[in-house]
Regions:
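Formylglycine-dependent sulfatase
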Residues: 1-196
Length: 196
């Protein structure tokens, strides 16, 4: 069995064509929505995305799990969806951003190395990182967590895009090299990606 859980950032519920938007066309998401389970009456627990994500991951309110803001650590030892699914024998991977940071103070107090398996899982809400939001394979503070190359970058290299990180250089940047578009601040978000 596979579970694909997609959590968007900065997306209104009615900005998908499967939700009836008259102009925005989202055929791939519509296809997934048609075949899967749609949470059409879901409500966030916090106006900040990081805190709301932690509520989804833990099943608890922000006042209980303690994450009140983005980039605020989830305490070491807090069980998440990833921890529970892993106990059931499932591989649990995270792709993208979470606004999550490790509980460095708690890990230091318990003698946990940030680049250990438990340290990396702690910094990724109990999941194993697969590919970061910038297209790179996840790295711990002391080096690579996963030795295999980034699948995004390898696919772009096969298409002729050069460099160590073609995802950053071509897909996640503006037309000129000095105008890098990042996250929801992208100045070029209304233009197609710089990929052939």
């Amino acid at each position: 069995m596979n579970i694909l859980f997609i959590m968007f950032d900065q997306l209104r519920f009615d900005y998908l064509s499967c939700q009836g938007h008259p102009h925005l066309h989202t055929p791939n998401i519509d296809n997934i929505a048609e075949k899967g389970v749609r949470f059409s009456r879901a409500y966030v627990q916090s106006p900040t995305c990081g805190s709301s994500r932690m509520s989804t991951y833990t099943g608890r309110y922000p006042s209980s799990h303690g994450v009140q803001f983005n980039a605020y650590p989830l305490r070491v030892g807090e069980l998440t969806m990833g921890d529970h699914l892993r106990k059931a024998g499932m591989g649990c991977h995270l792709i993208g951003k979470t606004h999550m940071v490790a509980d460095a103070e708690g890990m230091q107090r318990l003698g946990l190395a940030p680049d250990s398996m438990i340290g990396v899982r702690q910094s990724e809400c109990g999941f194993d990182p697969f590919v970061r939001d910038d297209g790179l394979v996840a790295e711990g503070p002391a080096g690579r967590y996963d030795p295999k190359p980034s699948p995004y970058n390898e696919a772009l290299k096969e298409k002729g895009y050069a460099g160590d990180n073609p995802w950053h250089d071509f897909a996640n940047s503006g037309i000129d090299g000095d105008d890098v578009a990042s996250g929801w601040f992208m100045v070029n978000s209304d233009k197609p990606a710089n990929i052939k």
